[in-house]
Amino acid sequence: MARSLKKGPFADEHLLKKVEKAIESKSRKPIKTWSRRSTIFPDFVNLTFQVHNGKNFIDVFVTDDMVGHKLGEFAPTRTFGGHGEDKRKKK
């Protein structure tokens, strides 16, 4: 379900402060965040974020196509181990 237009997009304040600081200092250092729920704004383009997936941090380089999506969409939380293998087929 989409967010109401009258509410507007959401991003955590502490993340916006980190982004402003990175833009001012022209730092190429990744911005570490646990805020998977934050929307990607146009200001975030060409910045690298380290998004927490519950276990470790995944590097996410933001491009133009990602604007409007959430940071968490680009850091998968589940790993697929494959389906159970049939023991009878094994030779």
From Swiss-Prot:
Role according to the record: Protein S19 forms a complex with S13 that binds strongly to the 16S ribosomal RNA.
Q: What is the name attached to this protein's record?
A: Small ribosomal subunit protein uS19
Q: Which GO terms describe its biological process?
A: ribosomal small subunit assembly; translation
GO terms for CC? Answer: cytoplasm; small ribosomal subunit
On whether Disulfide bond is a keyword of this UniProt record, the answer is no
A single GO molecular-function term is: rRNA binding
Family the entry assigns: Belongs to the universal ribosomal protein uS19 family.
Q: Which residues cross the membrane?
A: none
Q: Which key words tag this protein in UniProt?
A: Ribonucleoprotein, Ribosomal protein, RNA-binding, rRNA-binding
- Give all cystine bridges in this chain: none
Q: Does the keyword NAD apply?
A: no
